[in-house]
Amino acid sequence: MARMSGLLAGLPTEVGGATINRLCGSGLEALSQASRAIRLGEAHISIAGGVESMSRAPFVMAKADKAYSRNVSVFDSTIGARFP
């Protein structure tokens, strides 16, 4: 999300981007990391923000075991569940 946003905004390809997935806390974590990088001299300028993308996609599917597999497991991601 961050990398694509930067590229679409016209930032050069040499500028990096990091996507943080902490559900509701993603935007706050992004601001915290940007602030830390500036305070420590790791960056002069940072762009930080957040997007909400979980409301419409609470269920996710794991990668298939093999190509064309029909054995699909669905997991509830609304509470931050990870794949087993």
Predicted regions and their residues:
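Acyl-thioester C-C bond-transforming condensing/cleaving domain
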Residues: G6-P84
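Helix-rich "cap/lid" substructures immediately adjacent to catalytic or cofactor-binding pockets
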Residues: A2-M4
